[in-house]
Amino acid sequence: MKTDPNKEKALNAVLSQIEKQFGKGSIMKLGEDRSMDVETISTGSLSLDVALGAGGLPMGRIVEIYGPESSGKTTLTLEVIAAAQKQGKTCAFIDAEHALDPIYAKKLGVDIDNLLCSQPDTGEQALEICDALTRSGAVDVIVVDSVAALTPKAEIEGEIGDSHMGLAARMMSQAMRKLAGNLKQSNTLLIFINQIRMKIGVMFGNPETTTGGNALKFYASVRLDIRRTGAIKDREEVIGNETRVKVVKNKIAAPFKQAEFQILYGQGINSTGELVDLGVQHKLIEKSGAWYAYKGNKIGQGRANAGKYLIENPEVSDEIETTLRAMLLGNGEKIAPDAADTAGDNVDLETGEVF
């Protein structure tokens, strides 16, 4: 189709003026490749990174992780913080539940000496701290644990039994409007941990919902539903959980995928066990009977021993992970242009809402 040269000239002039005033990338054509480059941080689980489609959680976005009690929500966020710190990023943990265990965090690989931590008195204070850290541009990852614990000031100052209908939802809605733009500008990843509640009187469909109203559901680029599916036993002793994570909403790649992995008590995500399983599945690691071999060299009898070998030989582990990431994610941490933002009309599996 022939375009008017004067209109084309005027369009180019106004685009350059907007970019000059508001920064490069403030306006662009939807098909331009640069809009699709999403920097990500690993979740600590390779299978979850693959399920997310981009190699991890996206920077500059809001992410919600929710699930029942003791399902691994905080463990997953601590794994993200550990991965971010290894890349030299600055992280903050807003502990609204006042339940963060620094000893456990250290076991998961978190550098607690350089982790910023706040235990706010009110929900407004927690969200203001988030906003201040975001606007500074100096913090790369912020975790809020949890939305359910963000109690409005009016509720804290009032008496038990007072009605505060919709107060937390209004607070979250206002915060989301304020935070979303600032996060994009500073390229900060903001993760909200959330709890599950039951809707009363629901006869059909899923009665589960998350706290804090609907604003977070709409503003989140990624929503993860994490569940404990079973116990891992060493003889009679329970040593961990089998965990399943569903990508309920995804604005950076195709949604509705899921990942399964193990969370071991006191150790976190069993990443070496995942490498063994994915290596066998994609024929990088040979399995003959109970023996596992890599490039013709035996690495252990049984999955546990093969995993132990990878822990003791990190260079082999890194080589397998790099190869698997290249195979399963294409070019690793970036996603192909045609795969990005395919979820324009995502349907939330839990609520049926369209985003």
Curated annotation (Swiss-Prot):
Among the Pfam families in the record, one is: RecA
Task: Write down the PROSITE patterns for this protein, in alphabetical order.
Answer: RECA_1 (PS00321), RECA_2 (PS50162), RECA_3 (PS50163)
- Database matches in SUPFAM superfamilies: P-loop containing nucleoside triphosphate hydrolases, RecA protein, C-terminal domain
**Example of a GO cellular component annotation carried by this entry:** cytosol
What is its biological role? Can catalyze the hydrolysis of ATP in the presence of single-stranded DNA, the ATP-dependent uptake of single-stranded DNA by duplex DNA, and the ATP-dependent hybridization of homologous single-stranded DNAs. It interacts with LexA causing its activation and leading to its autocatalytic cleavage.
Q: Which HAMAP family match?
A: RecA (MF_00268)
Protein name in the entry: Protein RecA
Annotated organism of origin: Shewanella halifaxensis (strain HAW-EB4)
- The protein's gene is named recA
